[in-house]
Amino acid sequence: EIILVDDGSTDGSTDKVNEWASHELVTAITQDPIGLSAVRMAALESAKGEWFAITDIDVRPEKDWIERMLEAAPSQSGEQVVAVTGRTIFGQADDVISRIRSIEIESKYRSRPRRTKLANGPCSMFKREVLLSLGGFDPSWYHAEDMEVSLKLVQDGGTIVYTPNAVVNHIPETGLRRFLQKRKRDARAHVRIHRRYKGVKHDFIGSSWIVLWMIPLVALGSFGIALYVHNLLNFEKLDLESFYLALTKEVILICILPLFWLSAYLRSNLPKRRLKGIFILITWSIALWQGILL
């Protein structure tokens, strides 16, 4: 069965959804614009199958995406597989934002283990009865509903497995303003997740933590360099000894964390050369802090 849910669209999509509903295998649901989590819950309550697969309007699944997830569904020893998640490939357009986003998401999937803590919204399927028994998707989670429901399943003893063979293709994510708004929203959702699900290790954060700490640690490193220069200026003669003595324990302690951050940044896939890329990282870091603090 195919279930289409229209979340109060105003671009003519409702007519198209109702047109498709004439097919015997298609169920169409229209509702007011109350959010993606409520959409998924409406579909879940209408579904009849053993497995409940979800995707989004801004992706195009490969024809075999559900077959590939079903292949990965059998539980191994000690597992109770309740969800399977696949891989989302972000397209690239002729702008820096889409390239950064595409490369970042690709790097996350490259290091993703088979057993994971997140069934991503664009490409996942769930044991329908298990998900319903835990309350399904919470409509109050307007965003990050996939994170919330995944952790609910894991805390109940379930296993989520990842298969790279199930693929959906995401449209390019373009535009700096929209990108920053989404990252701010992501940060706010992570705060909410950590408050509700304490002690749960998340394995799909990727390079966001590097970007998050960019502003404070670069500022801390700059202060350490300024302190070192200040110490140097107190010497009458600049030689090897003065350069060594100016490197006080305070300077070392202040600079050690920024050096660890710099090492992680240089090993990441984040942009490092072009000024525009650096500017995007700075504004991205600010957006994350806004989402956390505001």
Model-derived features: positions:
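Acidic donor-binding segment of Leloir-type glycosyltransferases
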Residues: 1-30
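Acidic donor-binding/catalytic loop of UDP-sugar-dependent glycosyltransferases
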Residues: 12, 16, 57-72, 151
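Glycine-rich, basic loop-to-helix element that forms the pyrophosphate-binding segment
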Residues: 31-47, 68, 118
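Short aromatic/hydrophobic "clamp" motif used to bind/position activated sugar donors
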Residues: 52
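Conserved donor NDP-sugar-binding/catalytic core segment of glycosyltransferases
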Residues: 64-96, 171
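Catalytic donor/gating beta->alpha subdomain of glycosyltransferases that bind UDP-sugars
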Residues: 73, 140-141, 147-202
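A recurrent flexible, glycine/aromatic-enriched loop bordering the glycosyltransferase active site
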Residues: 90-92, 107-126, 142, 148, ...
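Membrane-embedded multi-pass helical conduit in multi-pass membrane proteins
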Residues: 215-294
